Structures are given as C-alpha cells and as structure tokens.
Amino acid sequence: MPRSIKKGPFVDDHLLKKVKEMNKSNKKQVIKTWSRRSTILPDMIGHTIAVHDGRKHVPVFITEDMVGHKLGEFAPTRTFRGHGDHTERSTSLK
C-alpha cells in the first residue's frame, strides 16, 4: 500500500541534509548511507549514493527513472550462486 500523499515521501533527515549540502556546493562525492528505506527524490538526480547491502556499500548512480523508488531496490541483499550440481552419489541412488 503506498504512502499517503499528504504525508509525502519518506527520506531520512541525515541523507536529505547531505544531498542538499552537496547541491549547494555543487560537489559530486559518493554519499554513504545505511538508509535503504529512503525514497529517491528529484534533488538526488546525478548523485552517487553508496547503499549498504548488509556486507558492503553498493554505489548507485541516481537517474530520472529512479525517482519515487526506494534506495534499497537498487542494492540486492542476496547473492544467488546457483542450485547444487548432481553428484555421483545422488545419481547412483536412482
């Protein structure tokens, strides 16, 4: 269920503060954050935000298409290494 329009999109205050400071000074540095729950706003376009995935920070370059989505959508937390192969023992049991 989407968030109420009267409340507006959720963004952590510390992240929004960093983005606004970067926009004022026209700097483009990587912003490290653990806030996967924050919504991407138009102010963030062009910035690179390193989103934590549980082990490391994944750099995410923000584009126009990402506005309205959450930061966590672009930093997957699980790595799929494939299903197990058939061993000699498992095939001989059949």
From Swiss-Prot:
Q: Which InterPro entries match?
A: Ribosomal_uS19, Ribosomal_uS19_bac-type, Ribosomal_uS19_CS, Ribosomal_uS19_SF
A Pfam short name: Ribosomal_S19
- Keyword Ubl conjugation tagged: no
Drop me one GO molecular function for this one: rRNA binding
**Origin, by domain of life?**
Bacteria
Give the GO cellular component terms, alphabetically: cytoplasm; small ribosomal subunit
Keywords from the UniProt entry: Ribonucleoprotein, Ribosomal protein, RNA-binding, rRNA-binding
Any transmembrane segments, and where? none
Q: Name one GO biological process term.
A: translation
Q: NCBIfam families given for it?
A: rpsS_bact
Its function, per the record, reads: Protein S19 forms a complex with S13 that binds strongly to the 16S ribosomal RNA.
- Family to which the UniProt record says this protein belongs: Belongs to the universal ribosomal protein uS19 family.
Name of this chain's protein: Small ribosomal subunit protein uS19
